């Protein structure tokens, strides 16, 4: 595989292992083959070790002395937990923004919202979503919260949301609610919008993993994002803002 310039080799290895996991090529309990990764990516064992340290910290793999690295539990509950954490953690920063919104930040968020509303293509919409989150988090999340948010997003693949055709219709109402809550200075409403968005994203991601047969839906579960909730995962929030 050719080297990706501008991307750290460690990050390239992390992305590769996560892709193997999300495509079903690595499953719970599987051993991570360092030699295979080194050969496939054309990297040394140093960035592979660095990647495994990060993935162990993030709960994706566990290392066993003299035995190697193994994939941790990866199931419906794992996906739900990652998204739940993402919603809660982003909700902290968003609630802080609502508690103390400055004219500068409100202006920046409104500009991103205009781009979100005008983005009809999934990739452009996803880029605007990340810009909105960056704007909030760079201003209101400290280094520790920033790092924890990044770790929670490992199993929320950007490539999927850049190609998912319904991302705008599904996700935009939550950003409308969050932005309005920040303007109204309502921290709990801003937090709830983040949590609701993450809940919907979790069900959408699970539906795709069920379709790929990477995961098996629990008996009696409806994998669709707008059907009955997956057992153990009740959607707590519905946006009221329509998609224009």
Curated annotation (Swiss-Prot):
Protein name as it appears in the record: Uncharacterized HTH-type transcriptional regulator Mb0044c
This protein's record includes keyword Transcription regulation: yes
TM helices/strands, residue ranges: none
Residue ranges for the DNA-binding region feature of this UniProt entry: 34-53
Gene3D superfamilies noted in UniProt: GntR ligand-binding domain-like (1.20.120.530), Winged helix-like DNA-binding domain superfamily/Winged helix DNA-binding domain (1.10.10.10)
PANTHER family tied to this protein: GNTR FAMILY REGULATORY PROTEIN, TRANSCRIPTIONAL REGULATOR, GNTR FAMILY
Database matches in InterPro entries: TF_FadR/GntR_C, Tscrpt_reg_HTH_GntR, WH-like_DNA-bd_sf, WH_DNA-bd_sf
UniProt keyword annotations, A-Z: DNA-binding, Transcription, Transcription regulation
Keyword Magnesium: no
Single annotated GO MF: DNA binding
HTH gntR-type domain segment(s): 7-74
